[in-house]
């Protein structure tokens, strides 16, 4: 497992490989630029994980090559910031009890196309998913946003545009 626990900004240009996981734990910003093939989960507990390449699950990208299962991309208090060109990915994600943020600030829209259910880490309590960014294209979230034993609130901030296409059932709005 690789854990980044820094309060400043750092760029990791090398590819990460193996079966381990990656965790963004510090309040700083970590930018991953390597085409990584690690197959463990990516967890963002604090700060910002900035990437320019998101592929479908199972393919190498800045967040590894884990499957598209929601347990393999976890937002739990931190931000996944997309800074690349227009892209579609079938990756689902989970939101923990500390909430999480998707930031679409690339040169093109980011489209999360998987229509499965968003995952949850921690079964009770209120969690907030924040959608933000500066990209004014139609950034899309097709995943179903539910509650799963708690309430899931949804917040939109920033100048970017987000389109929700899932059959959402969350009660925390």
Stretches found by the model and what they are:
Residues 1-11, 17-31, 39-111, 115-140, ...:
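Beta-strand repeat architectures
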């Amino acid at each position: 497992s690789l854990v980044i626990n820094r309060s400043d900004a750092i760029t990791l240009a090398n590819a990460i490989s193996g079966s381990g996981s990656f965790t963004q734990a510090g309040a700083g910003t970590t930018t991953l630029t390597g085409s990584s093939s690690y197959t463990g989960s990516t967890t963002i507990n604090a700060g910002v994980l900035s990437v320019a390449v998101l592929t479908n699950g199972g393919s190498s990208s800045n967040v590894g090559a884990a499957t598209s299962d929601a347990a393999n991309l976890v937002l739990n208090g931190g931000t996944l910031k997309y800074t690349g060109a227009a892209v579609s990915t079938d990756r689902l994600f989970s939101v923990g009890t500390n909430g999480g943020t998707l930031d679409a600030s690339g040169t093109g829209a980011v489209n999360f196309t998987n229509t499965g259910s968003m995952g949850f880490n921690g079964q009770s309590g209120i969690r907030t998913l924040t959608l933000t960014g500066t990209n004014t294209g139609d950034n899309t979230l097709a995943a179903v946003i539910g509650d799963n034993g708690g309430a899931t609130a949804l917040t939109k901030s920033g100048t970017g545009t987000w389109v929700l296409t899932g059959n959402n059932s969350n009660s925390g709005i």
